[in-house]
Swiss-Prot record:
Its main location: membrane. It is found in: Cell membrane; Cell projection, Growth cone membrane; Synapse; Cell projection, Filopodium membrane. The modification Phosphoserine is found at residues 41, 86, 155, 157-158, 206-207. A lipid is attached at residues 3-4 (S-palmitoyl cysteine). Residues 1-242 are annotated as: Disordered. Belongs to the neuromodulin family. Keywords: Calmodulin-binding, Cell membrane, Cell projection, Cytoplasm, Developmental protein, Differentiation, Growth regulation, Lipoprotein, Membrane, Neurogenesis, Palmitate, Phosphoprotein, Synapse. This is Neuromodulin. The keyword Lipoprotein applies. Changing residue 4 to G: Lack of palmitoylation. Phosphorylated. Phosphorylation of this protein by a protein kinase C is specifically correlated with certain forms of synaptic plasticity.
Length: 242
């Protein structure tokens, strides 16, 4: 409220001054008045902050200081009005900082825009080297898939190779049994010839020997057949597992 009252008082004073000087108003005077108004508004804003920050007990002191500042500002304004020769020179510095501030802000904005443009460029440059990564991943996945397919394709062939390798030793065992039987057959014939030439006692012994040989010959094919059957079952089991 106090600040508002002060502003109204200053406005009233300015209005009175304008009424008095309606005949000889100059642009320098208008600029000076605008500068004084701006200064008064800034001072009022500062005093408000001080009043809010200070305690209630310190409020009167702050008000007194604000009043003194306002009075000093009014005194300065009157002195400037009295010296008409010095008013244009003083009004120019009052109005000068505003365009400079504007130019400063305008000068900062293009640099900020350039920075903003530089950031997307950097992002695109970073994204460009990172782009080949998906293709490399696809190539790696394709290689792994081809390797797995090759392993699956080779597995039946390896099993097929293992099966003939197992069959070969089994086939080798069968001729061995046949050769053993062929070797025992001449021995049996020789024993029969000896039995015919020898007396009856020897014939009985030879007959027993022949029976033993025949029993052995009969058991060998059975054993070989059993072995062949067992090996055949093993092959079938291996094929089923494959």
């Amino acid at each position: 409220m106090l600040c508002c009252m002060r502003r109204t008082k200053q406005v009233e004073k300015n209005d009175e001054d304008q009424k008095i000087e309606q005949d000889g108003i100059k642009p320098e005077d208008k600029a000076h008045k605008a500068a004084t108004k701006i200064q008064a508004s800034f001072r009022g804003h500062i005093t408000r902050k001080k009043l809010k920050g200070e305690k209630k007990g310190d409020a009167p002191a702050a008000e007194a200081e604000a009043n003194e500042k306002d009075e000093a500002a009014v005194a300065e304004g009157t002195e400037k009005k009295e010296g008409e020769g010095s008013t244009p020179a003083e009004a120019a510095p009052g109005a000068g900082p505003k365009p400079e501030e504007k130019t400063g802000k305008a000068g900062e904005t293009p640099s900020e825009e350039k920075k903003g443009e530089g950031a997307p460029d950097a992002a695109t440059e970073q994204a460009a080297p990172q782009a080949p990564a998906p293709s490399e991943e696809k190539a790696g996945s394709a290689e792994t898939e081809s390797a797995t397919k090759a392993s699956t394709d080779n597995s039946p062939s390896s099993k097929a190779e293992d099966a003939p390798a197992k069959e070969e030793p089994k086939q080798a065992d069968v001729p061995a049994a046949v050769t053993a039987a062929a070797a025992t057959a001449p021995a049996a014939e020789d024993a029969a010839a000896m039995a015919t030439a020898q007396p009856p006692t020897e014939t009985a012994e030879s007959s027993q020997a022949e029976e033993k040989i025949e029993a052995v010959d009969e058991t060998k094919p059975k054993d070989s057949a059993r072995q062949d059957e067992g090996k055949g079952e093993e092959r079938e089991a291996d094929q089923e597992h494959a």
